[in-house]
From Swiss-Prot:
Pathway: Amino-sugar metabolism; 1,6-anhydro-N-acetylmuramate degradation; Cell wall biogenesis; peptidoglycan recycling
Keywords: ATP-binding, Carbohydrate metabolism, Kinase, Nucleotide-binding, Transferase
Function: Catalyzes the specific phosphorylation of 1,6-anhydro-N-acetylmuramic acid (anhMurNAc) with the simultaneous cleavage of the 1,6-anhydro ring, generating MurNAc-6-P. Is required for the utilization of anhMurNAc either imported from the medium or derived from its own cell wall murein, and thus plays a role in cell wall recycling.
EC number of the protein: 2.7.1.170
Superkingdom of origin organism: Bacteria
Catalytic function, reaction form: 1,6-anhydro-N-acetyl-beta-muramate + ATP + H2O = N-acetyl-D-muramate 6-phosphate + ADP + H(+)
Enzyme class (EC, first level): transferase
InterPro entries linked to this entry: Anhydro_N_Ac-Mur_kinase (IPR005338), ATPase_NBD (IPR043129)
Keyword Transit peptide recorded: no
Protein name according to UniProt: Anhydro-N-acetylmuramic acid kinase
């Protein structure tokens, strides 16, 4: 069974940077050693946003974007290696999630698409890459997402305490770690995505630092109720979603009925949408004693305060409080999934994704010996 140093690379739906994590992994433990966040050039970020909202690209443009993202991921890995004074031979493999540009797990031909050419990463780092983690699960009838609950269960499950792990990235997803029950998990809906999109359009800021804008506004209840009527929120699990659904166009369609509203009030309403949809799912799932939050949203004081208010009797904390960096959780998970792939172990949980069976995930892109 392969063990040693692994690198995880994650570029999520928030597009706030490439997260790269170095860890030692074996069958007994996962120990994070180092991490960094690598910036995404504005031009690349905009290209990804455009394609996620349905803008048509030529095959040439699509191929170029795939190559550019692969090179970006390789640059991020090489920066971490240099910072840690490591060589390619010191790393067993890289687990690279890729950049999701479309996720459509339902319908006649279910599919998901993550780009960022793994061949570029191998060629530029000299390290074996494991990628394309989601499509095997979809081929077996699953949603292909979320995949991180298996990792949450391995690290954070408790024999007697009802726990849930909440990742608030661009999309929010919940892992249900309930003693005596199969692991559950699904996407609850928008996390930071709509808030980030709104403040970017209104104020040219990548995100609402310390929720300053949202805290200066007031929740527009009719707008909130209008958004909550979206059928995704009442859809039963297993379910997953992404930027191809909850994007700026989705927000604009709801705002048409509310002309002239204060932008800060919209920001406050979007924050409330995130916390209400999360808390409703926590309660529908039977509640928990401890909700551990990770992802960029864990640093948003308004989101954390509202979750605590909406979930009385639940200890709302961050995964940092139990020794796991909330910023690095997903990248660490894909390093762990790469280890499982190389070990020939399944990486999905049918109780989460709805797949017909457990399966080894991913494709292996071997480095030259």
């Amino acid at each position: 069974m392969k063990s040693g140093r692994f690198i995880g690379v994650m570029s999520g739906t928030s597009l706030d940077g490439v997260d790269v994590v170095l860890a030692t992994i074996d069958e007994h433990r996962v120990a994070q050693l180092a991490s960094l966040s690598w910036p995404i050039p504005v031009s690349l970020k905009q290209a990804v946003l455009d394609i996620c909202q349905g803008q048509q690209l030529t095959l040439s443009q699509f191929g170029q974007l795939d190559t550019q993202l692969g090179r970006l991921f390789a640059d991020a890995v090489n920066a971490l290696l240099k910072e840690q004074n490591l060589q390619a031979r010191d790393i067993v493999a890289i687990g690279c999630h890729g950049q999701t540009v479309w996720h459509e797990p339902m319908g006649v031909a279910p599919h998901t698409l993550q780009i960022g050419d793994n061949n570029q990463i191998v060629a530029r780092t000299g390290i074996t890459v494991v990628g394309d983690f989601r499509r095997r699960d979809i081929a077996l009838g699953g949603q292909g997402a979320p995949l991180v609950p298996a990792f949450h269960h391995a690290l954070l499950a408790h024999p007697t305490e009802r726990r849930m792990v909440l990742n608030i990235g661009g999309i929010a997803n919940l892992s249900l770690l309930i003693p005596g029950q199969p692991v559950g998990g699904y996407d609850t809906g928008p996390g930071n995505m709509l808030m980030d999109a709104w403040i970017w359009r209104q104020a040219g800021k990548p995100y609402d630092k310390d929720a300053e804008w949202a805290r200066a506004g007031k929740v527009i209840l009719p707008l909130l109720q209008n958004m909550l009527s979206d059928p995704y929120f009442s859809q039963p699990a297993p379910k997953s979603t992404g930027r191809e659904y909850f994007n700026y166009g989705w927000l604009e369609r709801h705002l048409r009925h509310f002309p002239g509203v204060d932008p800060r009030d919209v920001q406050a309403t979007l924050a409330e949408l995130t916390t209400v949809t999360i808390s409703e799912q926590v309660l529908l799932s039977g509640g928990c004693e401890r909700l551990m939050v990770c992802g960029g949203g864990s640093r948003n004081p308004l989101l954390m305060a509202r979750l605590a208010a909406l979930l009385p009797g639940t200890e709302v904390t961050t995964t940092d409080a139990v020794g796991i960096s909330g910023d690095d959780m997903e990248a660490l998970a894909f390093a762990w999934l790469a280890w499982r792939t190389l070990a020939g172990l399944p990486g999905n949980l049918p109780s989460v994704t709805g797949a017909s069976q457990e399966t080894v995930l991913g494709a292996i892109f071997p480095a030259n010996p």
